């Protein structure tokens, strides 16, 4: 897979030289090309932003350097005989990233990322890009970051680990949270007893069918408590009647726990009260 990343901070992506992603790049499974947006400016100050039309706070990224950079990305793809890459624009206004989306991106031969900063990228850049390539605006969550770089790192790792040959044991990818529409259950390793806490006996039994059943039940319970909407989104018949009962029991238990107030004066109680916080006023896309 080819990945192009456009940013004013290309050094932000040094982590892609590490761990599984770095090894995948060294083996040629993943090819990452960084583009410095400022290389496509034509003034002494290498300006990439300006004040917004209509007024308002902050600055907006100018269209000219973005247009030239994306033209260069498409030209490189054409030189290698590849259709224009799928352009992903990280932004809090985009569609939420999911495991299904990561799987879809992993099937693409070429991805490009446009990392915005400040108040974002001039909208005409995306309008123009859509004339030549597919464009998807993607959010990694309902919060705001200072720029699109961190979100791009998240998306690249989520996608790259799905490529054949990146993860040593590909079966582990199939057991991940969200891979089957459920959160992954708890994991344990040696020693069997640590600080008085024991590994569940079933995991020591050697009974593979019982272990698989226990893991699925734990995944269902955890999903029911932490992300019940994922269970609601499963296709009809995905859960057996027994599993549906487990999920209902877990939800009921979680609801009762939430309704039980903490003891007076306990840490985190309303009487103690955490200090107030205010949301960040940083304004760009992730």
From Swiss-Prot:
Which terms under GO biological process does the entry name?
tRNA N1-guanine methylation
Q: Which GO terms describe its molecular function?
A: tRNA (guanine(37)-N1)-methyltransferase activity
State one Pfam family annotation. tRNA_m1G_MT
Its GO CC terms are: cytosol
Q: Which residues cross the membrane?
A: none
Presence of keyword Cytoplasm: yes
Which residues of the sequence carry a binding annotation for S-adenosyl-L-methionine?
A: 116, 140-145
**Where is the segment annotated Disordered?**
232-286
The record's SUPFAM superfamilies line, in alphabetical order, gives:
alpha/beta knot (SSF75217)
Q: What is its EC number?
A: 2.1.1.228
Keywords on record: Cytoplasm, Methyltransferase, S-adenosyl-L-methionine, Transferase, tRNA processing
Q: Where in the cell is it found?
A: Cytoplasm
Enumerate the catalysed reactions.
guanosine(37) in tRNA + S-adenosyl-L-methionine = N(1)-methylguanosine(37) in tRNA + S-adenosyl-L-homocysteine + H(+)
Q: Does the keyword Transcription apply?
A: no
NCBIfam families given in the database record = PRK00026.1 (NF000648), trmD (TIGR00088)
Record-stated family:
Belongs to the RNA methyltransferase TrmD family.
Job of this protein: Specifically methylates guanosine-37 in various tRNAs.
> Whom does it interact with, and what assembly results?
Homodimer.
Q: What is this protein called?
A: tRNA (guanine-N(1)-)-methyltransferase
Q: Which organism is it from?
A: Acidothermus cellulolyticus (strain ATCC 43068 / DSM 8971 / 11B)
Species lineage: Bacteria, Bacillati, Actinomycetota, Actinomycetes, Acidothermales
